[in-house]
Amino acid sequence: MHKTYFIADLHLSETRPNLTALFVDFMQHLAPDADAVYILGDLFDFWIGDDERSPLIDTVKNQIRTLVQQGVPCYFIHGNRDFLLGKRFAGDCGLRLLPEYQVIDLYGEPTLICHGDTLCTDDLHYQAFRRKVHRPWLQWLFRRLPLKVRLKIAQNIRTKSSRDKQNKSQAIMDVNPEFTRRIFERFQVKRLIHGHTHRQNIHQIPPHFERIVLGDWGETASILEVTPQDIRFRQ
């Protein structure tokens, strides 16, 4: 049976081996039967450059490489935690990098996919930070810092982000409905799949739009399975 899987917000790190185990289980037991696998950002808890090496990174590369060698394409859209993941990493394992917005033909239904952070336009502080860290010259400079320095910077940013979230309302950290509606119209689609907010759900939006939100990974995995006949979340 034809099926495509979508995952996001795994936040893999050396400190949470249970998440890596869930990812390996997915890649070895579910993914090989798919037509394609789409990773919609935040595969890693943070990413400081393609020159970093670790057992976790090797494991992820090996799993993606094996899946691709089995004939299942694996696509990736950058998240807010791993936006520096680049062509070197992708080339090592056969991962296909996509732009921040991508329309795909999902069994006859044009479907827009993205990470989702760009939809949260009410979070003005985050959007300003996002614009700053996506400046090419700043990324060029960051990549040339020593690994230890980059790691320290990333850890500080992550700590500050966690602290800032405690002072933000849930509404601010969710998608802006009007902006999201304009995105539907801009790309001329009726279905949108994204992650980032960690609020797993399937929203039906009048008159005919569908917004599917991927969940984050914790005690269990959040996996969206799409077939020509059905859409469902698997755990």
Swiss-Prot record:
Protein residues bound to substrate: N80, R81, D123, S161, K165, K168, H196
Upper classification of the organism: Bacteria, Pseudomonadati, Pseudomonadota, Gammaproteobacteria, Pasteurellales
Protein's name according to its UniProt entry: UDP-2,3-diacylglucosamine hydrolase
Gene Ontology cellular component terms for the protein in this record: cytoplasm; extrinsic component of plasma membrane
Chemical reaction(s) catalysed: UDP-2-N,3-O-bis[(3R)-3-hydroxytetradecanoyl]-alpha-D-glucosamine + H2O = 2-N,3-O-bis[(3R)-3-hydroxytetradecanoyl]-alpha-D-glucosaminyl 1-phosphate + UMP + 2 H(+)
Binding site for Mn(2+) 2: D42, N80, H115, H196
Gene: lpxH
HAMAP family linked: LpxH
Cell compartment(s), UniProt: Cell inner membrane
